[in-house]
Swiss-Prot record:
The lineage of its organism: Bacteria, Bacillati, Bacillota, Bacilli, Bacillales. This is Biotin synthase. It is an enzyme of class 2 (transferase). CDD domains: Radical_SAM. It comes from Bacillus cereus (strain ATCC 14579 / DSM 31 / CCUG 7414 / JCM 2152 / NBRC 15305 / NCIMB 9373 / NCTC 2599 / NRRL B-3711). [4Fe-4S] cluster binds at C71, C75, C78. Keywords: 2Fe-2S, 4Fe-4S, Biotin biosynthesis, Iron, Iron-sulfur, Metal-binding, S-adenosyl-L-methionine, Transferase.
Length: 332
């Protein structure tokens, strides 16, 4: 039987990264363009980097959708957008009591980080105060790390969230700057970068990632990883487009499981010390190879996403245990 020869020494590349030698954009593209038969070797190499920085720990995050739908923005991938016809639940803000209850559910699900998310372009000062009230109570009664994702922020709002005890702020870049106008016209790529920077300047750990599979090229996919490196995102959620019926991108071809694995590996090579989270689309796009993704990533969401269902927490706990990995509770 003819043996398949690998094109690159992926392990050597991984050890170079461990020794703090940054890979090039050409290296990142090579990972994404590698033959599918090489994917296990690539994931094994990515694990060398992952294990060096994070061992066998897996961080769990839980989302609460505190305000659903009713968003004036026209992001083509989003079922909560004003232009979406997807049949989702739409509701205004949950009470502070409900948000606090969600924190205790996060603990029951063994999550260490609780993500308070609200749809919309940007929060009003009154809405920020609403979140702050819940955050203060959660901080007083739990050891959870708190992440917020509320849309665009001004400097004052970012500062008040930091003062209240918000550890992390999520604002994804979503896609490559070259591709942004094709998915959204109501704000710009630079608007998103600006909010990440405002959160960081306020002393909040920045969380920013992308949604892969929205028409970006392979080269742009690699450049997204380097852009996230440039803005110094501490946590990088890797989402994979779920082409929801009723959204403008409903006909978009979704990435294959192997393509998703290559994205995760490439992201680990480019951002070796950062928390890399397998996020939206994990169950739908990775399917039966979900466990392999954790050889590059070190974080997942547990439970449901904003408008799509996740798998049962017990399934995630079992997957982590079956890999010989351990849940890292209450840690950023």
């Amino acid at each position: 039987m003819k043996q398949v020869q690998t094109k690159r020494d992926w392990k050597k590349l991984a050890y170079d990264v461990v020794e703090e030698k940054m890979i090039t954009k050409e290296d990142a593209i090579a990972i994404l363009e590698a033959d599918d038969t090489e994917v296990l070797e690539i994931m094994n190499a990515a694990y060398i980097i992952r294990h060096h920085h994070f061992g066998k720990k897996v961080k769990l995050n839980m989302i609460i959708n505190t305000k659903s739908g009713l968003c004036p923005e026209d992001c083509g991938y989003c079922s909560q957008s004003i232009i979406s016809e997807a049949p989702i639940d739409k509701y205004a803000w949950l009470t502070q009591e409900k948000i606090v209850e969600g924190a205790h559910e996060a603990i029951r699900r063994k999550a260490g980080t609780y993500c308070i998310v609200a749809s919309g372009r940007r929060p009003t000062d009154k809405e920020v105060n609403h979140v702050i009230g819940a955050v203060k109570e959660i901080r007083e009664t739990t050891d959870l790390k708190i992440c917020c994702c509320l849309g665009f922020l001004n400097e004052d709002q970012a500062g008040r969230l930091a003062e209240a005890g918000v550890h992390r702020y999520n604002h994804n870049l979503d896609t490559h700057a070259n591709n942004y106008d094709s998915i959204c016209s109501t704000h710009t790529y630079d608007d998103r970068v600006d909010t990440v920077q405002k959160a960081k300047q306020a002393g909040i750990s920045p969380c920013s990632g992308a949604i892969f599979g929205m028409g970006e090229t392979i080269e742009e996919r690699a450049e997204i990883a380097f852009e996230l490196q440039r803005i110094d995102a501490d946590s990088i959620p890797c989402n994979f487009l779920v082409a929801v019926k009723g959204t403008p991108l409903e006909g978009q071809k979704e990435l294959t499981p192997v393509e998703c694995l290559k994205v995760l590996a490439m992201m680990r090579f480019v951002n070796p010390t950062k928390e890399i989270r397998i996020s939206g689309g994990r169950e739908i796009n990775l399917r039966s190879v979900q466990p392999i993704g954790l050889f590059a990533a070190n974080s997942i969401f547990v439970g449901d996403y904003l408008t799509t269902a996740g798998q049962e927490p017990t399934a995630d706990w079992g997957m982590i245990a079956d890999l010989g990995f351990e849940i890292e509770e209450c840690a950023l």
